[in-house]
Regions:
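Class II aminoacyl-tRNA synthetase catalytic cores and aaRS-like
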Residues: 1-587
Length: 587
């Protein structure tokens, strides 16, 4: 028999009754019932119940052990009997009568309970992450991640893509976030950067003649944490394709995402095909370029209805309306709570009206609406008895943000929100440029390296604020999973695009010398995308925080509490790297 086990703790069934077995694992739980000791033994594969009777060496040995100690046991598989079957366990029809026990690793008193979600704070969990990962939910999340990545590789290969590695030590990149830098010992005063993404390398692979690339790529950005973004390190499925237009990128990625979410989504419905929603339309209808389409409500732009209005709350402002069916009969509390929610987002309040049975409007602002206002609102919003309408007014970006969040909250409160579904969409036609309101300068709106729609002619003849880029995002349930673009592979178009944003030719030639040089040696039209692995797993696991799907994440302050990183370097090491440290003075 094997030194440690003949079977795993998730393997034994009723057909194994009478078999002598050897198991190894962790002492998950213990119960003493009528003098008989019951132990749940856990390993990677599952749980098996052990039984030890008083007066036996096995009882004495197991009785002394602490939870989470590792043991090897020898014993015989016996039936639990029909009345004692545990239907929640695959091994629930049997138990193992223990004959021999060997302690493999004793556990100290635990800092928190492993076999229950007891509300321990995240900092404690991250300090003892090796214990936290023993919890069933965390173990399930990490194995889900493993399975998803394995499936990604298989499906991408089946779609004709080739997995290739790109460098980890590289030069600083123009993605926009802060780099993590690595000092060079051999080249004093010079630094490598950890890649924010393999963007330039995957484009260079296309220029090198490799047609379809993918990589499960580690990316490093020195940026603050959010619920859907872990600081420091994250992983994405980087993809690049040659001789493609936008729809050529969409087709394999949409197929991949649909199959992944159908396979690992726990039976939740996946909406396919994914609708294509232009950026401007998304901002107007949903108040966001990351719309949660589970909310079955839409905003309507009614700015024109109130142009020249004497109602000061709306006059001269961008006005958005949110019609909500079947809520007019709700109590005043319903409306007040939604107004309070809007205030938490920065609104001064939330105007609203009800639609009465006769079609008239009632509510706090009804008296400020003219007959023409009412007629236009009724027609534009397709109002009917039982509707209520909520209004937001202000600057475009401000009212979009507030009313976009109100849209989702109202849908949840009013029963117009879908559950158990993954609603995907593509956001397309992003503006190439935007104007800084303070300086009046034109700058890139999103990705400066995407191809402008209309090419060089558009750059030379159109108002920059009217130019759209071949840029696109995948959004699912209000979470941005990926950004991508058809790349700007022509040097003259790239130089002109940067000129419009205020960069002279010499600066661009110097800053992006490597890419421009490569583009001048026969670059193919190419495009790509990079879905975030961590966010995909977060959605599939139905977790609110991305750190719940990463084995060893940094905390919100970019610290590894378990390993003690970041650490200080010894003086000798600093000298070797030609560095000195100046700490900020305390304020």
């Amino acid at each position: 028999m094997h030194r440690y086990r003949s079977h795993t703790c998730g393997e034994l069934r009723a057909s194994d009754v009478g078999t002598d077995v050897r198991l190894s694992g962790w002492l998950h739980n213990r119960r003493d019932l009528g003098g008989i000791l019951f132990i749940d033994l856990r390993d990677h594969y599952g749980i098996t119940q052990l039984v030890a009777r008083p007066g036996t060496p096995a009882y004495d040995a197991l009785d002394k052990l602490t939870k989470e100690s590792t043991v090897r046991i020898d014993g015989k598989v016996v039936s639990r009997g029909a009345e004692n079957v545990n239907a929640d366990l695959p091994t629930g029809e049997i138990e193992v009568e223990v004959g021999e026990v060997e302690l493999l690793g004793a556990a100290q008193p635990l800092p928190f309970t492993i076999n229950a979600e007891d509300g321990v704070n995240e900092e404690r969990r991250l300090e003892y992450r090796f214990l936290d990962l023993r919890r069933e939910r965390m173990h399930r999340n990490i194995m889900l991640r493993t399975s998803v990545i394995s499936a990604m590789r298989h499906k991408m290969t089946a779609l004709g893509f080739n997995e290739m590695a790109t460098p980890i030590l590289s030069a600083t990149s123009p993605e926009g976030a802060r780099d993590f830098v690595v000092p060079s010992r051999l080249h004093a005063g010079r630094f490598y950067a950890l890649p924010q993404a393999p963007q330039q390398f995957k484009q260079l692979l296309m220029i090198s003649g490799f047609d379809r690339y993918f990589q499960i790529a580690p990316c490093f950005r020195d940026e603050d944490a959010r619920a859907d973004r872990s600081p420091g390190e994250f992983y994405q499925l980087d993809v690049e394709m040659s001789f493609v237009e936008q729809e050529d990128v969409f087709q394999p990625i949409e197929k991949l995402m649909t199959e992944l979410f159908e396979e690992f989504g726990g039976g939740r419905h996946v909406t396919s095909p994914f609708p294509r929603i232009p950026f401007r339309e998304s901002m107007l209808k949903y108040g966001s370029d990351k719309p949660d389409l589970r909310a079955q409500l839409e905003l309507t732009d009614i700015t024109d209805i109130f142009e020249g209005s004497e109602f000061k709350a709306f006059a001269g402002k961008h006005v958005r309306a949110l019609p909500v069916p079947d809520v007019a009969a709700q109590s005043r509390k319903f409306f007040d709570q939604l107004g309070d929610f809007a205030v938490t987002l920065g609104a001064k309040g939330l105007a609203w009206v009800r639609v009465a049975e006769d079609g008239s409007l009632t509510g706090p602002i009804a008296k400020f609406l003219t007959e023409q206002n009412v007629a236009e609102l009724t027609k534009r919003l397709s109002l009917a008895a039982g509707h209520a309408v909520f209004f937001g007014a202000g600057e475009f970006d401000e009212v979009s943000k507030i009313m976009g969040a109100v849209r989702v909250e109202a849908a949840k409160r009013a029963g117009h929100f879908e559950e158990n579904v993954f609603r995907f969409c593509w956001i397309v036609d992003f503006p190439m440029y935007e104007k800084d309101e303070e300086s009046g300068k034109i700058d890139f709106s999103h990705n400066p390296f995407s191809m402008p729609q209309g090419g060089l002619e558009a750059l030379e003849t159109q108002d920059p604020l009217d130019i759209l880029g071949w840029q696109y995002d995948i959004v699912c349930n209000g979470v941005e999973l990926s950004s991508g673009a058809i790349r700007n592979h022509e040097p003259e178009i790239m130089l002109k695009a940067f000129e419009i944003a205020g960069y002279d030719r010499e600066t661009v030639e110097e800053k992006f010398a490597g890419m421009l040089r490569a583009f001048r040696f026969g670059a193919p039209p190419h495009g790509g995308i990079a879905p975030g692995v961590d966010r995909i797993v977060m959605l599939l696991a139905d977790e609110p925080n991305i750190r719940e799907t990463i084995a060893f994440p940094l905390n919100g302050n970019a610290q590894d509490l378990m390993m003690g990183a970041p650490t200080e370097l010894e003086e000798a090491r600093l000298r070797e790297l030609h560095l000195s440290v100046r700490k900020p003075q305390p304020k």
